[in-house]
Amino acid sequence: MARMIQCAKLGKEAEALDFPPLPGELGKRIYESVSKEAWQGWLKQQTMLINENRLNMADPRARQYLMKQTEKYFFGDGADQASGFVPPTEG
C-alpha cells in the first residue's frame, strides 16, 4: 500500500514520494510533506526556469537559485515564473 501524506503544496491527502528527492534537510522536508503529484508539478516548473533563464547547472549559483526556488514553490509564496509564460486555458 502506498504511503499517503497531507500534501503541503496541494492541501490534500495524496500519495507520498518513494524517497527523498534531494539531499539534506530540504529533501527530508519534501519527502515528509510533498506528494508525487506536487513533485511532478515542480519538475515542470523547474524545467521552465532552467530553459527560460538559460541556467547552467554546472554553475553553483544556478543550483543555489533552484534550491531557493524549490523551497519557495513548496513552502513559501511560490517560485518565480518563467518570463513570457502563459498558463494553458481550460476549454
From Swiss-Prot:
Pfam family, one: Iron_traffic
SUPFAM superfamilies on file: YggX-like
GO biological process annotation, one example: cellular response to oxidative stress
Keywords: Iron
Superkingdom of the source species: Bacteria
GO cellular component annotations of the record: cytosol
TM region positions: none
InterPro entries: Fe_traffick_prot_YggX (IPR007457), Fe_traffick_prot_YggX_sf (IPR036766)
GO molecular function, one term: iron ion binding
Family: Belongs to the Fe(2+)-trafficking protein family.
PANTHER family reported for this sequence: FE(2+)-TRAFFICKING PROTEIN-RELATED (PTHR36965:SF1)
Task performed by this protein: Could be a mediator in iron transactions between iron acquisition and iron-requiring processes, such as synthesis and/or repair of Fe-S clusters in biosynthetic enzymes.
The name this protein goes by in its record: Probable Fe(2+)-trafficking protein
Organism: Burkholderia ambifaria (strain ATCC BAA-244 / DSM 16087 / CCUG 44356 / LMG 19182 / AMMD) (Burkholderia cepacia (strain AMMD))
